[in-house]
């Protein structure tokens, strides 16, 4: 058996091929797993669990079917869907996890997260993240009418795209010291995350021992998952 990890699908109505690929994944590979972990940015945007977007209800039903089949499903918030709440989690049968979670998997101690908190060189993003994660601001935003939230979200995405276009690729990647610090804080030799859209397996030293950072790919033109078994940790790309 295996435990599966995915991230950065950025589901939206404008990308039906990705949605179809995810549905096939849920009906196939996911049903064979010991557990499924979604490490953030499942959706391109999330403005509240009360958004009547049909895509959200379709995905909730599909994930719930996996959960009901006996495969526990877990979710860590990303930078795009950090407002996904308990209502949607309940509808989809997912368990919400904190932004950093340590798992004991087949004899390995593994830290999982979305990954945006590791990009500490991007001071502008980290300041923005700290602001939008303030509980009072989230409560205020979610109390706004839905049409207002949609306008704000669209403007924020446009601003983010413009800001990122002028940033170097290095700034938007993880900071190596932040990676080592997180792994040593949790006393792990394995880290799995997404966010950067740069799939790879990196070797490093943490806790004075060899360690590994596994980065999930985004679902743009193909699927990406990490498959952890008793024998191996594999980064796998597959066609939709």
Curated annotation (Swiss-Prot):
The keyword Cell inner membrane appears for this protein: yes
Substrates-to-products reaction catalysed: UDP-2-N,3-O-bis[(3R)-3-hydroxytetradecanoyl]-alpha-D-glucosamine + H2O = 2-N,3-O-bis[(3R)-3-hydroxytetradecanoyl]-alpha-D-glucosaminyl 1-phosphate + UMP + 2 H(+)
Predominant location category: membrane
GO cellular component: cytoplasm; extrinsic component of plasma membrane
EC number, as in UniProt: 3.6.1.54
Subcellular location per the Swiss-Prot or TrEMBL entry: Cell inner membrane
GO molecular function, one term: manganese ion binding
Primary role: Hydrolyzes the pyrophosphate bond of UDP-2,3-diacylglucosamine to yield 2,3-diacylglucosamine 1-phosphate (lipid X) and UMP by catalyzing the attack of water at the alpha-P atom. Involved in the biosynthesis of lipid A, a phosphorylated glycolipid that anchors the lipopolysaccharide to the outer membrane of the cell.
Family, per entry: Belongs to the LpxH family.
Name assigned to this protein: UDP-2,3-diacylglucosamine hydrolase
Taxonomic source organism: Escherichia coli O1:K1 / APEC
Lineage summary: Bacteria, Pseudomonadati, Pseudomonadota, Gammaproteobacteria, Enterobacterales
């Amino acid at each position: 058996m295996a435990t599966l990890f995915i991230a950065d699908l950025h589901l939206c109505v404008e990308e039906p091929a990705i949605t179809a690929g995810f549905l096939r994944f849920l009906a196939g590979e996911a049903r064979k797993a010991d557990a499924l972990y979604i490490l953030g940015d499942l959706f391109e945007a999330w403005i509240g669990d009360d958004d009547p977007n049909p895509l959200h209800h379709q995905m909730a039903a599909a994930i719930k079917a996996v959960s009901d089949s006996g495969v526990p499903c877990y979710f860590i918030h990303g930078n795009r869907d950090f407002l996904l709440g308990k209502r949607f989690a309940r509808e989809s049968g997912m368990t919400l996890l904190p932004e950093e979670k340590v798992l004991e998997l087949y004899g390995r101690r593994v830290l999982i997260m979305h990954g945006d908190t590791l990009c500490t060189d991007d001071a502008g993003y980290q300041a923005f993240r700290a602001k939008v994660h303030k509980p009072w601001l989230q409560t205020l935003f979610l109390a706004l009418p839905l049409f207002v939230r949609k306008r704000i979200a669209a403007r924020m995405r446009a601003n983010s795209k413009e800001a990122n276009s002028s940033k170097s690729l290095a700034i938007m990647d993880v900071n190596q010291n932040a990676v080592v610090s997180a792994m040593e804080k949790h006393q792990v030799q394995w880290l799995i995350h997404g966010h950067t859209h740069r799939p790879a397996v990196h070797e490093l030293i943490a806790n004075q021992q060899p360690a590994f950072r596994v980065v999930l790919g985004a679902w743009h033109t193909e699927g990406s998952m990490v498959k952890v078994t008793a024998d191996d940790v594999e980064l796998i790309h597959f066609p939709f």
